[in-house]
Amino acid sequence: MKPKVFITRAIPENGIDMLREHFEVEVWPEEREIPREVLLEKVRDVDALVTMLSERIDGEVFDNAPRLRIVANYAVGYDNVDVEEATRRGIYVTNTPDVLTNATADFAWTLLLATARRLIEADSFTRSGEWKRKGIAWHPLMFLGHDVYGKTIGIIGFGRIGQAVARRAKGFGMRILYYSRTRKPEAEEELKAEFKPLEELLKESDFVVLAVPLTKETYHMIGERELKLMKPTAILVNIARGKVVDTEALIKALKEGWIAGAGLDVFEEEPYYNEELFSLKNVILAPHIGSATFGAREGMAELVARNLIAFKNGEVPPTLVNKEVVKVKKPGFR
């Protein structure tokens, strides 16, 4: 009899096809997030669970899932999973790093360039017919933006995605600064990147890109004090987690001109709507789509499947998050 896996949202078929060879597979069929009470019911007879960032996977879920042995999170981050509690119970937790690195770094640059050059404003101006109504074919002062080439970029969080952002910055001839919990000598050499304390990075950067995981230490690490350290011409890009930035402080910074603009792919709560923030012209907004390319999402689905299949075969999953769990229970559904 095959072990059973429940997938909380439809993922690309390549991953599901791989899983069907080894598991009894059930997929939540709706686009909306699975209701909490339904999730708690569905996990009662599953051996494995594929989850999204939007689901809170905690002790309550584990209490309702007596057979659960592994949680495969369809994301590189895993702040939605109580990893410590999972480890205590011998439940393996995996994620999907690497396969979404380039897509997410590309999107950081999409936000950076679009914000710097006021792309959404210009698109709206053109699409609405305002350009035609004004009757001005070209004007020296129309939609002036900020130069990118040769400027200074500060990257907060210098893991895979942060370094991928930096590689792209090299092509723009930029000075690259970074801040991280630990220094990265090899990356510094490869990318000609300079390690800076957070305050110095904020003061010196023309563009600040957030690429840190959400932890107790990074919660609201960018608040009023930090935003006031930035240049009034600087642009903030957040591809990390919404809670890394104090939203109320950011709104104030954008309205009062402490910084020039922001590009946001993540928010403190998701889905999200904030009329005050969303009415501002100097911010570009996206609904958490940093990894939303066909290649990245298919790669994530394949990695989810590889993790679960490895576990089923009694092997340590390739991208195991809680490595200490192997001391609690060996991999496998035995």
Curated annotation (Swiss-Prot):
Binding site for NADP(+): 158-161, 180-182, 239-241, 288-290
GO CC annotations, alphabetized: cytosol
UniProt keyword list: Cytoplasm, NAD, Oxidoreductase
EC number: 1.1.1.26
Catalytic reactions on record: glycolate + NAD(+) = glyoxylate + NADH + H(+)
Organism superkingdom: Archaea
Primary localization class, coarse: cytoplasm
SUPFAM superfamilies (alphabetical): Formate/glycerate dehydrogenase catalytic domain-like, NAD(P)-binding Rossmann-fold domains
Compartment(s) of residence: Cytoplasm
Enzyme class, spelled out: oxidoreductase
PROSITE patterns recorded: D_2_HYDROXYACID_DH_1, D_2_HYDROXYACID_DH_3
A Pfam family this chain is assigned to: 2-Hacid_dh
Statement: the UniProt record of this protein carries the keyword Cytoplasm: yes
Disulfide bridge map: none
One example GO MF annotation: glyoxylate reductase (NADH) activity
Active site residues of this protein: 241, 270, 288 (proton donor)
Matches recorded under NCBIfam families: PRK13243.1
Assembly description: Homodimer.
PANTHER family referenced in this protein's UniProt entry, alphabetically: 2-HYDROXYACID DEHYDROGENASE-RELATED (PTHR10996), GLYOXYLATE_HYDROXYPYRUVATE REDUCTASE B (PTHR10996:SF283)
Family: Belongs to the D-isomer specific 2-hydroxyacid dehydrogenase family. GyaR subfamily.
Protein name as it appears in the record: Glyoxylate reductase
Species of the source: Thermococcus gammatolerans (strain DSM 15229 / JCM 11827 / EJ3)
